[in-house]
């Protein structure tokens, strides 16, 4: 029929297309949808597709001026969720033309924009995204890559060790630098600014950068190893952030840091570009992620935030510990850890991976395990994360009864013992405690650490189960 037909029509007539063959260039999304009572799955799934792509709530005259078939999002498959009567997974395909090249901000504004406030839905969670190769290639991604980082640091065949300086707020710059020096001298590879250390009245950023650089060079001279401190460049404006990164580069330090969710993807991508151009490694902290990813039925799963970070750029990202004080179910965590590190990841629903993802030549990101871990966790961490990871012991280093440097020694000895045992073919999962006990016989620092944290366990059920 010719002409324009006004009025509201069912979304599913246009946007639910179960026979659609997805294209290699489509961005694919898996949403966990909880519709309001009485809204059928096809209609709810189609509603998600329309509201996150071309449509609005009614037909409009200007629809006739465009090719809807070319630009519309399509809900192409719906599957039930085991054990959840009210939820289902809706798969939506978006044509690549809907997205600006090289912009995570634009991708998210479309896919997880207004649609999350949609009345016909009780709750909505983005579980996974398949980023097509054609779109991946429009991003620079991480400034360096895992191999490049190892070459810069001259550290091979083991995880890297870090430590967040505590108390996180209140130290003067000089005392802060002293804590950095003690940890690095004792055997850590990195120390870290806490995510909320920016430039507060008690310690302005420039003073901190200076004293930390002094600590790094002093520790390097003493140990003969390359050291680093994640200088947090996060700031109130992008210009100020870049100014801090420039100062770090002038000091000659190896690495800076950014809070990518609070700082925002636009700022993060700018910083990642600066870091690649100037040879700085970039450590990424995920402060605020739990606001977005912790609820099972609403929000965005962390694996999507991790993919977005790999596109935006970062060399390290915090990704949970599986064993410490923060959320993380083992299989799910390993799923997004591999998404960060590997070039190609097969679809595997047992690990929460809904789509096969090919990253082509985008560099990988080192996962950082941090939060409530100590020397007794070392065998499990080495086993779970493997060599390509950063293990961060904040309280687990600084809380050592003989203070920071011995705390660092204990952590390094435990790590080297675990790596050696693994290389000799021992089973870390089964013999972990035994390996640590043996090592502590010839390291008084480790023995003292083992004594303090004998039986600490954080026993809660993880909320993020499949």
Swiss-Prot record:
It catalyses: 2 (2R)-3-phosphoglycerate + 2 H(+) = D-ribulose 1,5-bisphosphate + CO2 + H2O; D-ribulose 1,5-bisphosphate + O2 = 2-phosphoglycolate + (2R)-3-phosphoglycerate + 2 H(+). Its EC number is 4.1.1.39. Belongs to the RuBisCO large chain family. Type I subfamily. The record marks 325 as: Transition state stabilizer. The modification N6,N6,N6-trimethyllysine is found at residue 5. PANTHER family: RIBULOSE BISPHOSPHATE CARBOXYLASE, RIBULOSE BISPHOSPHATE CARBOXYLASE LARGE CHAIN. InterPro entries: RuBisCO (IPR033966), RuBisCo_large_chain_AS (IPR020878), RuBisCO_lsu_C (IPR000685), RuBisCO_lsu_C_sf (IPR036376), RuBisCO_lsu_fd_N (IPR017443), RuBisCO_lsu_N_sf (IPR036422), RuBisCO_lsuI (IPR020888). The disulfide bond which can form in the large chain dimeric partners within the hexadecamer appears to be associated with oxidative stress and protein turnover. GO terms for cellular component: chloroplast. Coiled coil: none annotated. The basic functional RuBisCO is composed of a large chain homodimer in a 'head-to-tail' conformation. In form I RuBisCO this homodimer is arranged in a barrel-like tetramer with the small subunits forming a tetrameric 'cap' on each end of the 'barrel'. It is found in: Plastid, Chloroplast. Its cofactor is Mg(2+). One of its GO terms (biological process) is reductive pentose-phosphate cycle. Keywords: Calvin cycle, Carbon dioxide fixation, Chloroplast, Disulfide bond, Lyase, Magnesium, Metal-binding, Methylation, Monooxygenase, Oxidoreductase, Photorespiration, Photosynthesis, Plastid. Binds 1 Mg(2+) ion per subunit. The modification N6-carboxylysine is found at residue 192. The active site is at residues 166, 285. One of its GO terms (molecular function) is monooxygenase activity. NCBIfam families: PRK04208.1 (NF003252). Substrate binds at residues 114, 164, 168, 286, 318, 370. Heterohexadecamer of 8 large chains and 8 small chains; disulfide-linked. The disulfide link is formed within the large subunit homodimers. This is Ribulose bisphosphate carboxylase large chain. Mg(2+) binds at residues 192, 194-195. It is an enzyme of class 4 (lyase). The gene is rbcL. RuBisCO catalyzes two reactions: the carboxylation of D-ribulose 1,5-bisphosphate, the primary event in carbon dioxide fixation, as well as the oxidative fragmentation of the pentose substrate in the photorespiration process. Both reactions occur simultaneously and in competition at the same active site.
């Amino acid at each position: 029929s010719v002409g324009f037909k006004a009025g509201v029509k069912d979304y599913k007539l246009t946007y639910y297309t179960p026979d659609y063959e997805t294209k290699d260039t489509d961005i694919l999304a898996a949403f966990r949808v909880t519709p309001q009572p009485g809204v059928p799955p096809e209609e709810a799934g189609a509603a998600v597709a329309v509201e996150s792509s071309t449509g609005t709530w009614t037909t409009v005259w200007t629809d006739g001026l465009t090719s809807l078939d070319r630009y519309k999002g399509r809900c192409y498959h719906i599957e039930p969720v085991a054990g959840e009567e009210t939820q289902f997974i809706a798969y939506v395909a978006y044509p690549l033309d809907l997205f600006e090249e090289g912009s995570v901000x634009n991708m998210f504004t479309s896919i997880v924009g207004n649609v999350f406030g949609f009345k016909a839905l009780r709750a909505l969670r983005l579980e996974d995204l398949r980023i097509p190769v054609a779109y991946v290639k429009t991003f620079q991604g991480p400034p360096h890559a895992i191999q490049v980082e190892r070459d810069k640091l001259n550290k091979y065949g083991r995880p890297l060790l870090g430590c967040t300086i505590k108390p996180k707020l209140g130290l003067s710059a000089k005392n802060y630098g002293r804590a950095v020096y003690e940890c690095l001298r004792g055997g850590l590879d990195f120390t870290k600014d806490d995510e909320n250390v920016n430039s507060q009245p008690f310690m302005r950023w420039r003073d901190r950068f200076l004293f930390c650089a002094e600590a790094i060079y002093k520790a390097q001279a003493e140990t003969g190893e390359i050291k680093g401190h994640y200088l947090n460049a996060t700031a109130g404006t992008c210009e100020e952030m870049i100014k801090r990164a420039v100062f770090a580069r002038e000091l000659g330090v190896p690495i800076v840091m950014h809070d990518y969710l609070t700082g925002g993807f636009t700022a993060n991508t700018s910083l990642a570009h600066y870091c690649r151009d100037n040879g700085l490694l970039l450590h990424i902290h995920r402060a605020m992620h739990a606001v977005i990813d912790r609820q099972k039925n609403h929000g965005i799963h962390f694996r999507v935030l991790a993919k977005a970070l790999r596109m935006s750029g970062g060399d390290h990202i915090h990704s949970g510990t599986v064993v410490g004080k923060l959320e993380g179910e083992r299989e799910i965590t390993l799923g997004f850890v591999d998404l960060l590190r590997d070039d190609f990841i097969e679809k595997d629903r047992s690990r929460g991976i809904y789509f096969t993802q090919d990253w082509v030549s985008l560099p990988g990101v080192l996962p950082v395990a941090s939060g409530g871990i100590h020397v007794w966790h070392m065998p499990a961490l080495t086993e779970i994360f493997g060599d390509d990871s950063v293990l961060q012991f904040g309280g687990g280093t600084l809380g050592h009864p003989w203070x920071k440097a011995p705390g660092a020694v204990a952590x390094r000895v435990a790590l080297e013992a675990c790596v050696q045992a693994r290389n000799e073919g021992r089973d870390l999962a089964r013999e972990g405690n035994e390996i640590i006990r043996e090592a502590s016989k010839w390291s008084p620092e480790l023995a003292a650490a083992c004594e303090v944290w004998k039986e600490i366990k954080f026993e809660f059920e993880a909320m993020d189960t499949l």
